[in-house]
């Protein structure tokens, strides 16, 4: 099991965001986190990659990739994160470097120094996300969907055990959003776990996965027999998605 949370209380700025969280993730799973803005989705993800602390008195159990999160030292956080790929809604690419040089920068920063291996790995991840022909382009020359593909490629560079994607399709049109989720879903076939927060409830039917919902200060798992109207109700509660048209 990659993540095992039992009765975890999650705080942000001393304010209780989620209470008694039970959350588990196994290898190769695709997991959705849904809920309204401010419901705790991002806060939960932040505890997983060590951005938010978990105090020992606020958790019966909180283990991520073998690390007991209430006890983890800050010096261990970089090593933990190197086992993860983290994707945000805002792409955070280096705009003064080409696609290939963005990826090369990450590899060199994480200890890669063999030029041939670096070049080979960049080619592998760009092929995985369908961006081989864009390796020499600057980020400003790419559409929003293309930039997000590069971000996914960047997240895959070090062959992570899990990918945490916080609203990765939030600024994309529906077709491009579906393409991005399809790429993320495919990564699960190699054993990578993907945990994705989203407002876009329509993706759940098209790309099935386990679903957790943040609501009213708690986290609950929706099971396969959950009444369909429950998700329809959730969609009505969640703020409308603004999806500007972008050329892919």
Feature map (PLM): residue ranges:
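Conserved ABC ATPase signature
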Residues: 138-142, 146-148
């Amino acid at each position: 099991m990659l993540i095992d949370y039992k009765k975890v209380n999650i705080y942000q700025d001393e304010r209780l965001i989620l209470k008694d969280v039970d959350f588990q993730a196994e290898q190769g799973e695709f997991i959705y986190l849904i809920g309204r803005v401010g419901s705790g989705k991002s806060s939960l993800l932040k505890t997983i990659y060590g951005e938010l602390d978990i105090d020992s008195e606020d958790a019966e159990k909180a283990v991520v990739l073998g690390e007991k999160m209430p006890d983890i030292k800050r010096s261990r956080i970089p090593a933990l994160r190197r086992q993860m790929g983290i994707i945000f809604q805002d792409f955070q690419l280096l705009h003064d470097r080409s696609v290939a040089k963005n990826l090369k920068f990450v590899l060199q920063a994480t200890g890669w120094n063999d030029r041939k291996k670096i070049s080979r790995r960049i080619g592998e991840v760009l092929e995985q996300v369908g961006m081989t022909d864009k390796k020499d382009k600057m980020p400003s020359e790419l559409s929003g969907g293309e930039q997000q593909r590069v971000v996914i490629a960047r997240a895959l560079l070090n062959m992570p055990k899990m990918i945490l994607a916080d609203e990765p399709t939030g600024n994309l049109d529906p077709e491009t959003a579906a393409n991005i989720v399809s790429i993320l879903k495919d990564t699960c076939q190699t054993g990578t776990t993907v945990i994705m927060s989203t407002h876009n409830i329509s993706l759940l039917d098209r790309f099935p996965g386990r679903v957790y919902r943040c609501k009213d200060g708690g986290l609950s798992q929706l099971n396969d027999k959950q009444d369909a109207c429950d998700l329809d109700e959730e969609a009505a509660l969640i703020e409308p998605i603004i999806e500007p048209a972008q050329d892919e």
